[in-house]
Amino acid sequence: MNLEKINELTAQDMAGVNATILEQLNSDVQLINQLGYYIVSGGGKRIRPMIAVLAARAVGYQGSAHVTIAALIEFIHTATLLHDDVVDESDMRRGKATANAAFGNAASVLVGDFIYTRAFQMMTQLGSLKILEVMSEAVNVIAEGEVLQLMNVNDPDITEENYMRVIYSKTARLFEAAAQCSGILAGCTPEEEKG
């Protein structure tokens, strides 16, 4: 199955994900709205939330909470991008000025924090301690991955094992969490959740 077919299959759910993202970004603080909209409208394929949607379909989930899972997965990813661009001193992402280049480092870090905490508010609204546990652990692993990358940034002797640990921590763990949370929603066994 190609990406075009997957986009067709998930279009309705992904429209809901995008609407949820915009709704949940809303704040009384104007800078949060401006920077938040700037970063979420900057392109990207939304593959992580799409994994949550596809996993929910694969296990026969019939509810709508997978849309919330998918949106909060994208929020976690977005917050990591905001922080990562500050740490890496990046000024371009996807052919556009990074949020830190456009709004400053402090604003990017603080709005990243807002997006992280909003994701956790969304998790608690789902009422699943198991989802909260999975996502808390995943975010912790992501943070560890960021620190590992920082420690190895100028190390030409980094081992393949350490490099793969950074990749797993910064990227793969959130993909896993997206699929696992959809399995939890569907009432899968622990083995099925991770399978």
Briefly describe each language-model feature range:
Residues 15-16, 22-195:
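Mg2+-dependent prenyl diphosphate-binding active-site environment of isoprenoid biosynthetic enzymes
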Residues 1-22:
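N-terminal amphipathic/basic leader segments beginning at the initiator methionine
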